[in-house]
C-alpha cells in the first residue's frame, strides 16, 4: 500500500522530512516541464535514499499581488495536491502567501526557512525562480549560500515544446486562443476544471438539453465556445461523456461567463455535487442565434460531433 503524502501548511515539518529533496515553485498544472523536474528528483531520491518534498504557495504570488487577476489558474490547489500525491512525493508544504510572507527578505528566506526549518539536502528550482521581498532573490543567490547551509541547488534545463519553453504561461496562452490540443499535449493529459454544480436558470432544460452549471472560480478562461468533455463525480473513477458550453450564452444575453455541461445518457440531480470536467476537443466558437429553434438545431449538430470524439 502506497503511503499518502503528508500535507503541511507551514514550515514546521517533522524531523523525518528534513534533510530531504525540496522542489520549490507554483507548479500550476504540473505539466511535462514540471514532470521532468520530478523525474530527475526521483533519480536523486533513489541514489541518495532521501525523501521528496514540494514547497508551493497559496494563493500563487502573481494572483496575490494583482487582485484583478481573477481567472488565471490552470489547476486548483486540490487538483495540484492530488497530482503531487500521484507522483508519490513524501510531503507537500502549501504555504499561505500573505502580506507578511511577501515582505520577507531573500536572505532571511534562505537562512531562517531553508537553512533552519527545512534543512534540505537538494533544492530543485527553475532558472527563473524568484523569492523574497520585491522578488529580490534569485537562483544565483541560492547557489552562493550552498556551502553555508549545506544544500545543493539543482537547476535542470527546461523542456521545449515547438522551440518554446514548456511553461504554465504557454498553456494559458494556448487555452485562451482555443488551441486546446496543444495545451493538453504540454499537460500530458486533458485540461480540467473541478467545481461545484450550482443552480442556474434551467434554460438548457427548457429547450430539451439539461445542463449542470459549474462554478469556474479563478480558473483560466479558455476560448469561449463548445467543447467535447468527459465528467467525473468526486470520489468516483468512472467518467461520463458530454458536451460543454463555456461563455456568455449570447442568444440569451448573459453577462456572467458560465460553464454548462450536458451529460450523455444521464438523469439525476447534480446540484451541490463536485464534478471534474475534462476538456477533450474544441468544437466551435460561441455564436448568437436569431431564435431558440436555431440554437436547438445547432446543439443537435454539436452533440453528434461530441459523441464521435474519442
Label each residue range with its predicted role.
Residues 51-117:
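Active-site-proximal cofactor/substrate-binding loop regions of enzyme domains
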Residues 103-210, 290-294:
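Classical nucleotidyltransferase
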Residues 199-310:
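Phosphate/ribose-recognition catalytic cores of enzymes acting on nucleotide-derived substrates
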Amino acid at each position: 500500500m502506497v503511503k499518502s503524502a503528508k500535507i503541511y501548511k507551514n514550515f514546521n515539518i517533522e524531523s523525518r522530512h528534513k534533510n530531504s529533496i525540496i522542489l520549490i515553485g507554483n507548479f500550476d498544472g504540473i505539466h511535462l516541464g514540471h514532470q521532468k523536474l520530478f523525474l530527475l528528483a526521483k533519480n536523486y531520491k533513489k541514489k541518495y535514499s532521501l525523501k521528496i518534498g514540494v514547497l508551493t504557495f497559496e494563493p500563487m504570488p502573481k494572483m496575490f499581488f494583482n487582485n484583478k487577476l481573477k481567472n488565471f489558474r490552470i489547476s486548483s490547489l486540490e487538483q495540484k495536491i492530488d497530482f503531487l500525491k500521484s507522483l508519490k512525493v513524501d510531503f507537500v508544504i502549501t504555504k499561505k502567501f500573505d502580506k507578511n510572507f511577501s515582505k520577507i527578505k531573500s536572505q532571511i528566506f534562505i537562512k531562517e526557512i531553508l537553512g533552519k526549518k527545512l534543512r534540505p539536502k537538494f533544492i530543485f528550482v527553475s532558472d527563473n525562480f524568484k523569492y523574497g521581498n520585491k522578488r529580490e532573490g534569485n537562483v544565483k543567490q541560492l547557489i552562493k549560500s550552498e556551502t553555508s547551509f549545506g544544500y545543493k541547488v539543482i537547476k535542470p534545463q527546461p523542456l521545449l515544446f515547438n522551440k518554446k519553453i514548456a511553461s504554465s504561461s504557454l498553456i494559458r496562452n494556448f487555452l485562451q486562443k482555443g488551441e486546446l490540443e496543444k495545451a493538453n499535449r504540454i499537460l500530458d493529459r486533458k485540461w480540467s476544471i473541478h467545481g461545484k454544480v450550482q443552480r442556474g436558470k434551467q434554460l438548457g432544460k427548457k429547450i430539451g438539453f439539461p445542463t449542470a452549471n459549474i462554478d469556474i472560480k479563478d480558473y483560466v478562461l479558455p476560448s469561449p465556445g463548445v467543447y467535447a468533455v468527459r465528467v467525473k463525480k468526486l470520489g468516483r473513477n468512472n467518467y461520463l461523456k458530454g458536451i460543454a458550453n463555456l461563455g456568455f450564452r449570447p442568444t440569451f444575453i448573459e453577462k456572467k461567463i458560465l460553464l454548462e455541461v450536458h451529460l450523455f445518457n444521464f438523469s439525476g440531480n447534480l446540484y451541490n455535487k463536485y464534478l471534474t470536467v475534462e476538456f477533450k476537443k474544441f468544437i466551435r466558437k460561441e455564436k448568437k442565434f436569431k431564435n431558440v429553434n436555431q440554437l436547438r438545431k445547432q446543439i443537435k449538430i454539436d452533440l453528434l460531433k461530441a459523441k464521435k470524439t474519442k
